[in-house]
Amino acid sequence: MTTNSHTLHLEEILELLPHRFPFLLVDRVIDFKKWQFLYAIKNVSYNEPFFQGHFPGKPIFPGVLILEAMAQATGILAFKSAGKLDSSELYYFAAIDNARFKRPVQPGDQMILEVKFIKERRGVARFKGVTTVDGEVACEALMMCARRQ
């Protein structure tokens, strides 16, 4: 279903990530280059279950879930860069530093998730993540994921 070798659709994302509804937060990968970068999309719908309580009358996409979406994007880039893992291995979200939230994300927005590979050592990879909406930075952070059984 891929239109080119740098695009991943839902079926391919589901093969890489263990996350499922309602916690899969990457809709499509629009471009990537192994060991360098990945761009992905998360379309924000009012139908997301957390909008019932966050916040009634003023729905805001939770910041921690923006971070989780970027972490899932780093996992996809790590899997695509390192190749298929042993069936007992996963990439775990290991750390986050310097997280900043710059603008709210609301229903109807489309988040562009950008993650850039910084370095990898002994199964721990470091990335910089930036999420934008309409060209404006909504969130940025440094993240690490660890390859473990």
From Swiss-Prot:
CDD domains: FabZ. Gene3D superfamilies: Hotdog Thioesterase (3.10.129.10). Keywords: Cytoplasm, Lipid A biosynthesis, Lipid biosynthesis, Lipid metabolism, Lyase. It comes from the Bacteria. GO terms for biological process: fatty acid biosynthetic process; lipid A biosynthetic process. Its main location: cytoplasm. It catalyses: a (3R)-hydroxyacyl-[ACP] = a (2E)-enoyl-[ACP] + H2O. The keyword Glycoprotein does not apply. PANTHER family: 3-HYDROXYACYL-[ACYL-CARRIER-PROTEIN] DEHYDRATASE. Involved in unsaturated fatty acids biosynthesis. Catalyzes the dehydration of short chain beta-hydroxyacyl-ACPs and long chain saturated and unsaturated beta-hydroxyacyl-ACPs. Belongs to the thioester dehydratase family. FabZ subfamily. This is 3-hydroxyacyl-[acyl-carrier-protein] dehydratase FabZ. The gene is fabZ.
